[in-house]
Amino acid sequence: MGPHFTLLLAALANCLCPGRPCIKCDQFVTDALKTFENTYLNDHLPHDIHKNVMRMVNHEVSSFGVVTSAEDSYLGAVDENTLEQATWSFLKDLKRITDSDLKGELFIKELLWMLRHQKDIFNNLARQFQKEVLCPNKCGVMSQTLIWCLKCEKQLHICRKSLDCGERHIEVHRSEDLVLDCLLSWHRASKGLTDYSFYRVWENSSETLIAKGKEPYLTKSMVGPEDAGNYRCVLDTINQGHATVIRYDVTVLPPKHSEENQPPNIITQEEHETPVHVTPQTPPGQEPESELYPELHPELYPELIPTVAQNPEKKMKTRLLILLTLGFVVLVASIIISVLHFRKVSAKLKNASDEVKPTASGSKSDQSLSQQMGLKKASQADFNSDYSGDKSEATEN
């Protein structure tokens, strides 16, 4: 902490200049700076320079919005959106420093760079606001809600320009709808607007109120020649004044040609599916060449013109849908056939097994019966042999 550290503090002090503390109008920034002073600085800087550093930080933040260039004059006010963007960027950089846990000279360098960087960001946002957002109306009177950085107060800023927003030429065909549009791009953002009033302006400069309300559009259906002429739209404010005035010069054209309508020989697609055969009339006293196959002259055939040409993409989607449906039907049918075939094969196998069982039992019974008959015959043969032996013995005696 030698002379080099003192030079860093001097460089930080050179950036100071009293200005409008625009970014400090946000409560989140104020709370973050208090936490930064009471928590972070006590652990990362000596106590003897702690207060001086924090005083310079507060002055540097207060200088946000001071534009040094002569061609850029700062109004000293921003809208809520610009202030939110600047606040988010400042808090993000401040958190990055506290998370880095820097100390001593390196901490002072990083803090100095961050303050200069955030000051440039705020100035760029302020310039962008003044060029693109502040008073975007090219005509009329617009009221914007701005935050004035000197006192951190919200006030209405009046953008006064010419009330006359020009004349619009409108052409409409007879029996069509007439639409008068009185909405401008900045009307939604302006404050203190009330009602739209539409007037019919006559040749003697007198006016007749046609409609009044919150809607910026006037629609008149089935216009005729009597609707041609001059109209006027006036947007009122809560101060009983006018915000915008728009004039309209309406011309009613003849109705569109009948050839643009659907010709009588056009048939629909349903009628095209069932074509009608036209047979030419035969003059009296003259027979057709062939009653079975009459030949018609090409001019006698009706001209078939489709009403609407089919969209190729829609046609392709329809075909794909049909193919998918047919594929699903085939898949379901194949599954059903497979299940039925499996059941049929299972039934056949079951019947075959049932037939094999009685045959095996019958063969076993026949074998046992043959064994019993053999035993019976053997026993009878033994009996006959015994009887013949006894008989021979009796004869000998």
From Swiss-Prot:
Residue ranges occupied by any Ig-like C2-type domain in the UniProt entry: 167-251
InterPro entries given in the database record: Ig-like_dom_sf, IZUMO, Izumo-Ig, IZUMO1
Assembly behavior: Monomer, homodimer; disulfide-linked and homooligomer; depending on the context. Interacts with IZUMO1R/JUNO. IZUMO1 and IZUMO1R/JUNO form a complex with 1:1 stoichiometry. In gamete recognition, IZUMO1R/JUNO first binds to monomeric IZUMO1. The weak, but specific interaction with IZUMO1R/JUNO induces IZUMO1 homodimerization. The process follows a tight binding phase where IZUMO1 bends the entire structure towards the sperm membrane side through a thiol-disulfide exchange reaction. The molecule no longer binds to IZUMO1R/JUNO and instead binds to a putative second oocyte receptor.
Segments of skewed composition (Basic and acidic residues): 388-397
Glycoprotein among keywords: yes
Name of the featured protein: Izumo sperm-egg fusion protein 1
UniProt remark on domains: The extracellular domain assumes a distinct boomerang shape when not bound to IZUMO1R/JUNO. Interaction with IZUMO1R/JUNO triggers a conformation change, so that the IZUMO1 extracellular domain assumes an upright conformation.
SUPFAM superfamilies: Immunoglobulin
PANTHER family linked: IZUMO SPERM-EGG FUSION PROTEIN 1
UniProt region (Important for interaction with IZUMO1R), positions on chain: 148-160
Phosphoserine PTM positions: S379
Role summary: Essential sperm cell-surface protein required for fertilization by acting as a ligand for IZUMO1R/JUNO receptor on egg. The IZUMO1:IZUMO1R/JUNO interaction is a necessary adhesion event between sperm and egg that is required for fertilization but is not sufficient for cell fusion. The ligand-receptor interaction probably does not act as a membrane 'fusogen'. Plays a critical role in sperm-oolemma binding prior to plasma membrane fusion. Can mediate cell-cell fusion in cultured mammalian cells independently of its binding to IZUMO1R/JUNO.
Cytoplasmic compartment residues: 341-397
Tissue specificity annotation: Sperm-specific (at protein level). Detectable on sperm surface only after the acrosome reaction. Expressed in spermatozoa, more abundantly expressed in the head than the tail (at protein level).
GO molecular function, one term: protein homodimerization activity
Membrane-spanning intervals of the chain: 320-340
Pfam families: IZUMO, Izumo-Ig
Subcellular location as annotated: Cell membrane; Cytoplasmic vesicle, Secretory vesicle, Acrosome membrane
